[in-house]
Every structure is written in structure tokens, then in C-alpha cells.
UniProtKB/Swiss-Prot annotation:
Keywords of this entry: Cytoplasm, Gluconeogenesis, Glycolysis, Isomerase
Main location as per UniProt: cytoplasm
Annotated organism of origin: Shewanella halifaxensis (strain HAW-EB4)
NCBIfam families listed in its UniProt record: PRK00179.1 (NF001211)
Protein name: Glucose-6-phosphate isomerase
Gene from which the chain derives: pgi
Similarity-based family: Belongs to the GPI family.
GO CC terms in record: cytosol
Pathway it works in: Carbohydrate biosynthesis; gluconeogenesis; Carbohydrate degradation; glycolysis; D-glyceraldehyde 3-phosphate and glycerone phosphate from D-glucose: step 2/4
Subcellular location: Cytoplasm
Xref: CDD domains: SIS_PGI_1, SIS_PGI_2
HAMAP family: G6P_isomerase
Amino acid sequence: MTELTQQATWQALEKHSKTLSHMRELFSTEPQRFNDMSTQACGLFLDYSKNRASQETMSLLFKLAKDTQLESKIKAMFAGEAINNTEQRAVLHTALRAPADKVIIVDGNNIVAEVQQTLAKMSEFVESLTSGSWKGYTGKAITDVVSIGIGGSFLGPKIVSQALRPYWTGELNCHFVANVDGTSITEKLKGLDPQTTLFVMSSKSFGTQETLTNTLTAKAWFLGQGASQSDVAKHFVAVSSNVAKATEFGIDADNIFPMWDWVGGRYSLWSAIGLPIALLIGMDNFRELLAGAHEMDEHFANTPLEDNMPVIMGLFSLWYGNFFNAQSHVVLTYDHYLRGLPAYFQQLDMESNGKSVTLNGTDVDYSTGPVIWGGEGTNGQHAYHQLLHQGTALIPADFIMPLNSHNPVGEHHVQLASNCFGQTQALMQGRTYEEALAELSSSSLNDEQKQLIAKHKVMPGNKPSNTILMDKLTPSTLGALIALYEHRTFVQGAIWQINSFDQWGVELGKQLGNDVLDRLTASKDADELDTSSNGLINLFRQGNI
């Protein structure tokens, strides 16, 4: 047993998990349950009453958090301690949205001042493009921006830009490219005019394989349309730490925006990686996005655990994964603009907490990161919700919905809300055999048929969910929502005693991918690998099955 599973509180939770009543009973005996098990902060409202939890459950979970020094770990992160112990790095994405007068010292430098300088540089750049003063090589203003990245430098900007579609200023179109599949960039370049297109290349090293390959293809397309190498500086900018490589490529040093080691890719949308967001919604709205996230940072850092929204959500995820064997968690967004959030939270959580050793290198003997998945309501109700209601696996759910729509057309939003709330009720309440049989009482079926169909209509209920509401989707509430999930991810990792801020599995994939590339291009012998890999490489070389 590990140190965590040996703790008395952990073992008490194991025993307690087997004694809980069905949620139907909890609601019937606790008339104040909704009031007692809901909270709000930073423009968000969290109803966590539809969870398999009593007051004793909550007390034990909060005690586990305290026993594992969660509060001191939160302080360590905000203080800039090197909590990423495998890479000896601070974890300070929170500094990217800190106010200008904040002082956070890393390696002798006030990094908040550096962040503010970058924001000022971003403001100048955004103004020059949106005003039309930035001209391409033929003197025309820029109309289209192509953002090239991968992972966090792609998914964050794309999903946030999509979510904040109502706030686009309309001066620019933005296109996102990530996949190294040539089809992706080929399709994006169709219909674009090289004279009015600008590329933003985001790679800390300026050498990420997919990003560099796509950028070189973009450059070849640009030069192939009549531009010259000297024109590259007017149509390519970079977000990178490698100034030398970027300038060698042809990018003006003044048009290179910095990245820092204390920000991981999946936490980087708040930095210059978010440049595409700012180009679409303007810097004022981008700063509102940062302000909303900072407000959640303050809530997380300063609120007692018992009222702390990220702590509550993180504890529930741990509760189901470790004590009910839940292997996945579904995120359901009842707002079309938020349809991409499940994919963003998937990367955030699974890349952070998909770990199997503790900080000191001990193998864990408990489940860590679950599979995160989901989609938008009400589409999912006609697909995978069936599994949520009657499947054999326990799958906790988060429902996310604004109370007010940006597009209040007819009865659409009230129907959306009725479906959202109805799903949470159905998951909690279920339907008993007796209830199903009673519903069939007036049908023309005989008694034997009624009894059979009733068995198929039984739903066990007791399926947990959280509901997160906001008045309206704004840059501020979106910032708070994303920061909520960032900190929820941290809470789990801190209690599991794992490093949520490295990604060695990703690094191994890159390393082996490069080795296979050498063999695919025949610069290395394919027969040195396992027989499966050898066979696949040889099939690729011959080009047919």
C-alpha cells in the first residue's frame, strides 16, 4: 500500500462508500440539500447536490484534502515553487492573468512585469492588424490569419475563439492548423490570398515537428504565389523562445512573442499563445478573459476548502474514480458556443493526470486520471446518454449552461434548459420497476408483456452530476470556467501525489515518431524494430496493401 491508501481517512472513505443511501432518499430526507450543496463564485454557480454524498462524505473528503496538505500545495504553486519536480520548474500560468502590480519572482525576475510587457506588445500588434495599418508585401491590409500550432498552442486558442464567437470584432478571419496530415493545411489554404494572409507560428522551440512542417508548407505556398524571401517578415510572426531559429526562418525579431518555461502548453492560452483570440475579440475582451481567470485564481487561493469550487469538483472526481471505480467523466455543454470545451478539458485533465508514479517515483496503487469526454446538449441525448442512464459503468457528469443565450430565438433556450435540468434529474432519480409498470397500466399489452417491457424501462438512477450555470457566456465567465477546471485538475493531482505538469508519455511519442520517420524515409533499416512496426513500415514504403 502507498502512503495515500494507508491513510486513515482514505480507509474511512472506502468503508463509507459502501454505506450511502440512494440519492432519491438523500433528497427526500434533506429538504435543504440544494441550498446546502451549492455555491457560487466568479460569476459561476455550482450545484453539486446530485452527487452520491452526505454531510459525512463531505467531511471525510475535506479531511483527506487537509491530510494530504492540499492547502500548502496550493500556496506553493502560487508562490512560484518548483512543484514540477521532474523538470525543476515553477508552475505559474496564474501569473499570466495576474494584475500589473503583482510581484512574482522567478530566477530573480519579476515575471508579472514580463507578462505585462508582452500584453502591451500584443496590444500594439492587434491594433496594427485590426486597423489595417499592417500591410502585406503588396501594400494590402491583412484579412486572414492562419494560426499554426499543436496541442495547447492549438486547442486553447481554437476552442476559446469558438466559444467567444459573439465577441468577434469582424475585422479578421482566423483559421487554425495543427494536424501534420497535409490535408489539413491544404484545405485551410484554399481560397486564401497570400497578399492578405498572415501566419502565426506557435512553438516554444520553433522545432515542434507538426508545427514546423505546416509552417514550412505555408511558407512554400506563400513563396510559390509570387512573394520573395524578404516578404516573409510581413506575413509570418512567431510565438517562440527560439529567436535565432525564428529569425533564420525570416521572421522579424520584433514580431517574435515570448514563451516561458514556467507555463505548460495546455495552460498557455493566457499568454501570447492566445494571440489569435485577441485578434478576433480585441484586447479589451482578451483582458476580460484574463480577469475572469484571475478572479477564479483568487477564489481558489483564498477560499476555505469547504466553499472552494475547484476543490469541491476535484474531490468529487477523486471520490468516484477511487472509491466507485469510475473510469471516465463526461462534460456536457448546453450551449453551442461551448461545444469544443470537452475536447479542451480532455487534454487539460488527461495530459496532466495520466500518470502512474508519485512525485517520489513510487508506483501508485490507485486510479489516477479518468478518461474525459463529452459533447454538446441536446445532441448527446440522442446518442451516448443512453449509456449514462442504463449502462453498467458509473460515469459522473458535468452539465454546463448559461442562463441567458446570445441568440434568444423563440422557445429554443427554454427547451435547451428543460433538457439540461431534466437530464440531471433523470440521472439522479431513475425509474423503478414499479414506476415503469404503472406507466404501462393503460397500454394494450398483456400482463406478461407489461412486466417484460417494465424491466427494460427501469433506470437505476443514483448517477452523479454537477451543474454549472452562468448568467451569460462572456469573456470573463469563460475565463473563470476554464480556470475552474485547471484548478480542479490540480486538486486531484495534489491529492494523488503525482506531477500534473510534465508529460513524458507525449515526449516518448515524439522520440519514437522521429525514429520511425527515419526508417520510413529509408535513412535507417526498418528491420531493426519489432515485427509489427517493421511490417507496417514496409507496407508504407511499397505504397499498397
